[in-house]
Amino acid sequence: MRWTVSGLLALCVALAAPAGAQEIDAGRALFLGRATQTDDPALARRLARLPCKSCHGGDGQGADEGRAPPIDGPSLSRATPDRPAYDAALFHRAVTAGQSAGGRALSQLMPRYPMTAPEATALFAYLAALPAEQRQGVTPGRVTFGVAAPPGGGYRQTLQAALEARLGGAMVHGRTVAFVPVDPGNAATGRQVLAVLALPAGAVPDFAAEGIPALFPLGPLPGDEDPGTVRGFLPSAAGTRAALAARLASDARGPVAIWPESMAEGLRAALSANGPPAPSAKDPAREIVVLDGTELDGALKTAPGARLWIGWEAIRQAGHLPADREVIAINDVPALIGPRGDSPLAAHARLSGAVLAEVLKAAGRDLTRARLMAAFPAAWLDGLDLDYTAHPLTGTARVDFLPLR
């Protein structure tokens, strides 16, 4: 999602009634490093590389590492022995010139940003709203999550049952856990919940742009997402490529064809270091990896006799497998295919409920979006084959390779 900060601020002036919301939206884009169009293009580049949240945390509470202080609204508006309270003008001076409200020089570790006064005012307004945004969906007696999975398959019911089985009831830290539907095509529908579960992977960036955590997307993530915003339990696309490249490097009988060529770049790059070569007229393919099942039949004609490597999604797309080939199925969703015989969607809901229960236990009573996301490495995930300390984004790098014939 692209935010035009100057445009939003101009609208704030023109439309008095919704000005506060628009200013906060502009400030959020700055805070998250997603304001791609600013008065000075250098600001957008600097924020993308060094967003405020990377040092001060998604909740603005600061961090011990680098001694980043809290910058949420209550902290800035409270006078300390070292300085008076910040207002928008003093905050603008701080982020542009590195000078505190009291006039002293701020740490050189803090980047200076070429913000205009309206941009700094928008960021200041967002920081004031940040504590409330961090606690969306949290009341003294209830915590509410959004669920974006298709409504017809009983996903929410299976999710709720799995969570309650792991918790031993419907409550954690004195709160009932509730799930409500959200529209994966409209990130605004997730603003009133703590986090959203079961989004299509392609919808995650829009929710992240709203500052809404995305838990357990329904498909593989690319692999470069921020674990402070997104957590899954399926291997990322980058992780699957790495695992497949390693397996081909050890098991391939000769050159490897990848089909279609338009999707081959990532895997070919992973193979380039020590993997088998691409085929040639002199040395034809002995293995073929098919990434798009709709092109399976055409792909096989280009590599007669080659052993086929194909993932579950490509098998689903193709609707069949050749009877005259060796086939290795690439299982990049091992958590969803198990001995229970569940459908993949039911298995996803069951695992989501179990993981969420343990993360909520670890996050504690003082629950915010940032604390929820930070609790993953500390959660006790016994029996779930996940480790968010070793694999912060996905909890796993496991990919299985299954000979089918």
Which residues make up each language-model segment?
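Extracytoplasmic
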Residues: 50, 66, 118, 140-142, ...
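Electrostatic cytochrome c docking/interface patches
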Residues: 18-48
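Positively charged n-region of N-terminal signal peptides that target proteins for export
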Residues: 1-4
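Extracytosolic ligand-binding ectodomains
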Residues: 128-405
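Bacterial N-terminal signal peptides
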Residues: 6-16
